[in-house]
Curated annotation (Swiss-Prot):
Keywords: GTP-binding, Hydrolase, Nucleotide-binding. This is Ras-like GTPase HI_1637. GTP binds at residues 29, 32-35, 98, 101-103, 342, 344-345, 384. Monomer in solution. The lineage of its organism: Bacteria, Pseudomonadati, Pseudomonadota, Gammaproteobacteria, Pasteurellales. Its cofactor is Mg(2+). It comes from the Bacteria.
């Protein structure tokens, strides 16, 4: 008991004096969270060797405020350590490889030793140490957070809105099984498992079609819950409001309706809420990553799917200004950065368009954030740069292009991907074929001792960390 109280007191003191910064790196599946965290760690550790030469926009590195950076033991010993070394080893292979996708939660802690340049504490303590806690987790789990505000009926009705177009075609099998289910009958475990598997298969098919709004997220990446009854439910999108009310009044406790409701509530209250409280309710700063380019290359529905997923994230984080007392007793996010990833997949002149598009995508969900006095920033980056900018001569004209090793066939190619729309694409954009010539690229070879090549990670570090070294 005493140790727990002492630990909480130490956390409050450290938070109040800015000794600890908890960074939430959030984003939908395939947005590049693991690459972002790996590069962020690498850029900070590289300050020990390369000083500021690779991070010219990061003032604390440029002016010598940061004295040393090292990885240290994390506080929560029950969470796996982020496998930075393995990721770095993948980039050092010949040929280099991309990292394994995230399968569960992991954590890392960096100790950043620095010399204060300003502020009251420079008189009290010449040097300080900032502990930076960073978490990685599957993007699939992130989109379960909106369930915290929805009961089973509300969630089912939300799914009606998205089961259209391509999704409606993919859903035919599980919908036909659902239509034939008597929700008032006594529940059979085998029948529930069979329909839940059909619904899970549907979610996997949506993901394969480029959709990113996948709920429940654990259905496609269950981790240690695979096969558990907690993952064997599905939305009742065929019920009218009147039918819902009738079943709530008349369905017995052992009926399909009651069992499905109970499982949804368990999933929301135990699994999703536990995940949120353990990892998301106490963050100080947040980065929201979005791959805007892949949906542009895919379909209008994939793009709208991504936009809807991002806009649903904002309801589950506490934004607002942070003074000394706030930091002590009410942790909340005070700096928020929206980051468009894979900026190395387009030519340099298209990056302003990509940033503008990112603004457009999040505008509706993020508008209230700006009104609460929180610092917000929009940028485009490549956490791991895979291409180089080149000029090609075509029919006597010089054209900007990119060059890199294409993932699908490992061939070195040079191409102009096209124009990135600066605003939300209209119907005419999707009628063009192709909408956008977007390829995936392999990482560049990483030599021993070199820092990971990047695009604008120093701007990210400047926005997220600079005030802690003043």
């Amino acid at each position: 008991m005493f140790n727990r109280v002492q630990k909480e007191i130490n956390q409050i003191i450290n938070r109040g004096f800015d000794r600890t910064l908890r960074l939430a790196v959030t984003g939908l599946s395939r947005s590049g969270k693991t690459a972002f965290i790996t590069s962020l760690i690498n850029q900070l550790l590289s300050i020990n060797q390369h000083s500021s030469q690779n991070l010219p926009l990061f003032e604390a590195a440029r002016n010598g405020s940061i004295l040393a950076v090292k990885r240290v033991s994390q506080q929560d010993l029950s969470v796996p350590r982020f496998d930075y070394e393995s990721n770095l080893n993948d980039l050092s292979q010949n040929p280099p490889q991309w990292f394994q996708s995230t399968r569960g939660v992991s954590e890392t802690r960096l100790a950043i030793r620095f010399q204060r340049q300003s502020g009251l504490l420079r008189h009290l303590k010449e040097r300080g140490t900032l502990y930076l806690d960073i978490f990685d987790y599957p993007g699939e789990w992130l989109l379960d957070l909106p369930l915290l505000n929805l009961d089973f009926q509300q969630w089912s009705q939300e799914q009606i809105k998205v089961t259209t177009g391509v999704r409606a075609e993919l859903a035919q099998n599980w919908l036909s099984m659902l239509q034939n289910l008597d929700l008032s009958a006594v529940a059979n475990e085998d029948v529930l498992a069979k329909i839940a598997k059909s619904y899970t298969d549907y979610l996997h098919q949506c993901k394969a079609q480029g959709m990113q709004f996948i709920q429940p997220g654990r259905f496609v990446l269950p981790s240690d819950l695979e096969g558990a009854p907690a993952l064997q439910f599905f939305p009742l999108i065929h019920l009218s409001g009147e039918h819902w009310q009738t079943l709530k009044k008349t369905a017995k406790s052992n009926s399909y309706f009651a069992v499905l409701t109970k499982r949804y509530n368990y999933y929301r209250n135990k699994i999703v809420k536990g995940f949120y409280e353990n990892y998301f309710s106490t963050f100080d700063r947040q980065v929201i990553l979005a791959d805007c380019l892949t949906p542009l290359n895919h379909s209008q529905q994939a793009f709208l799917d991504m936009q809807m997923g991002l806009n649903q994230l904002f309801n589950n984080f506490h934004y607002g200004s942070r003074n000394f007392l706030h930091r002590l007793f009410s942790p909340q996010i005070d700096r928020l950065m929206f980051v468009a990833t894979k900026a190395d997949h387009i030519t340099r002149d298209q990056i302003p368009n990509l940033v503008s598009l990112m603004r457009q995508i999040v505008q509706e969900g993020g508008r209230h954030v700006e009104f609460e006095g929180i610092d917000t920033e929009y940028t485009a980056i490549a956490a791991v740069r895979t291409t180089k900018q080149v000029i090609v001569n075509q029919q006597g004209k010089e054209i900007k292009a990119i060059q890199g090793v294409r993932s699908i066939d490992k061939q070195l190619i040079t191409l102009y991907p096209g124009t990135v729309p600066s605003k939300l694409p209209k119907t005419e954009f999707w009628q063009k074929q192709p909408h956008f010539d977007f390829d995936s690229f392999e990482p560049q070879p990483l030599e021993q001792g070199e820092s990971i090549p990047h695009l604008r990670m120093d701007a990210v570090l400047q926005f997220l960390l600079s005030d802690r070294f003043e």
